[in-house]
C-alpha cells in the first residue's frame, strides 16, 4: 500500500486479502501484489483510506431484552465489514446508510448498566460511545380508566422502572397509535394528557423510556362520549344544601357511576351523583 508492505491471506486461487491496513493517513493509496516477496504488480488498483469518527449515539438507552435500533452518527463511516459490538457481546450486523450514519440493533444483555458500544470495520474498532441497558419497563394500571374522546384528560400511569428522559412518552393503541410526551413523577408513576380519539373505543396505554420501544401490557383506557348538561331541576333550593338536584343531559354512563367517577360540581364543591338513566343523573 504505497510503500508499506503487509502480509496477505489467500482466499482462493484468484484473490487474496490484506490482513490489516497500516496506512497512517487518509487518502487514496496504490495497492499492488507480490507472489515472491520481491516483485510487485504495477496495475494501479486504488484503495481509499478514511478516518472514521463516531460522534453521536441515539437512543442512548434501551431495555435488557435488546431490540433497540441504535443510530451512530459521525464522519467517514464505511459499509465494508461494518458491525457493532455492545460490551462483551458478540458483534452484530450494522447497516451503514451513508458516510455519516450507521444503524445496528442492540442484542439482549444479562445485566443492566452502561456498555461500551463500538463500530467495527473488519473487526477493527473505528469509534463508538456507550449504551445504557435499562430494566424492562412495566405498566400495571391507569387512573382514571376512562375519559372523553376530545382528549386532554390528565392520565396517571402506574408501573415500574420509569426513568426521567427527554424521550419519555405514552402511546394510546398499539403500533401506529398516537404518542404523547409523558411527565416523570417517579420510577413508578408518569403522567400524560390523553390525545383526541375519533370515536368511542378502548385503547391500550403503553410507555416508552427511549422514545422507540414501548411496553406491551395492554392496560386499557376507554374513550367515551363527552358528557353534556342540558338543564337542571329544580332551579332553586335552600342555601344550606341537602336538596336533591336532577341534572338532565347526555353522556352519563353506568360504568362511570360504578367506578365512582360520576360527580357533579356546584361552583367549587364536588359531590357524588347517582345515575337515573342514560340521559340524566341525580345528586
Task: Describe each region flagged by the PLM.
Residues 10-13, 94-99, 182-187, 275-278:
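RNA-recognition motif
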Residues 16-22, 101-107, 189-195, 282-283:
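Exposed aromatic-hydrophobic patches
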Residues 1-4, 77-91, 162-178, 252-271:
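Short, surface-exposed alpha-helix to beta-strand junction/turn motifs within ectodomains of secreted
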Residues 22-28, 107-113, 196-201:
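Surface-exposed, short loops/turns at beta-strand junctions within beta-sandwich domains
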Amino acid at each position: 500500500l504505497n510503500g508499506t508492505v503487509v502480509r496477505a491471506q489467500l482466499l482462493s486461487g484468484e484473490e487474496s486479502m490484506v490482513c490489516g491496513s497500516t496506512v497512517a493517513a487518509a487518502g487514496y493509496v496504490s495497492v499492488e501484489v507480490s507472489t515472491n516477496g520481491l516483485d510487485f504488480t504495477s496495475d494501479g488498483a486504488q484503495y481509499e483510506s478514511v478516518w472514521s469518527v463516531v460522534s453521536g449515539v441515539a437512543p442512548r438507552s434501551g431495555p435488557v431484552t435488546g431490540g433497540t435500533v441504535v443510530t451512530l452518527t459521525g464522519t467517514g463511516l464505511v459499509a465494508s465489514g461494518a458491525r457493532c459490538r455492545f460490551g462483551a457481546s458478540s458483534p452484530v450486523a450494522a447497516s451503514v446508510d451513508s458516510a455519516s450514519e450507521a444503524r445496528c440493533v442492540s442484542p439482549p444483555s444479562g445485566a443492566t448498566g452502561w456498555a461500551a458500544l463500538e463500530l467495527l470495520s473488519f473487526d477493527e474498532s473505528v469509534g463508538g460511545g456507550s449504551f445504557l441497558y435499562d430494566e424492562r419497563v412495566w405498566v400495571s394500571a391507569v387512573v382514571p380508566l376512562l375519559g372523553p374522546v376530545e382528549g386532554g384528560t390528565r392520565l396517571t400511569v402506574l408501573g415500574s422502572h420509569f426513568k426521567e428522559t427527554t424521550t419519555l412518552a405514552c402511546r394510546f393503541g398499539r403500533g401506529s397509535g398516537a404518542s404523547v410526551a409523558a411527565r416523570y413523577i417517579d420510577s413508578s408513576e408518569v403522567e400524560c394528557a390523553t390525545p383526541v380519539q375519533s370515536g368511542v373505543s378502548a385503547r391500550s396505554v403503553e410507555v416508552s423510556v427511549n422514545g422507540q420501544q414501548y411496553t406491551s401490557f395492554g392496560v386499557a383506557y376507554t374513550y367515551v362520549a363527552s358528557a353534556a348538561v342540558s338543564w337542571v331541576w329544580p332551579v332553586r333550593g335552600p342555601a344550606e344544601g341537602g336538596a336533591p338536584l336532577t341534572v338532565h343531559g347526555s353522556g352519563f354512563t353506568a360504568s362511570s357511576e360504578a367506578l365512582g367517577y360520576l360527580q357533579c360540581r356546584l361552583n367549587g364543591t364536588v359531590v357524588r351523583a347517582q345515575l337515573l338513566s342514560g340521559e340524566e343523573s341525580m345528586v
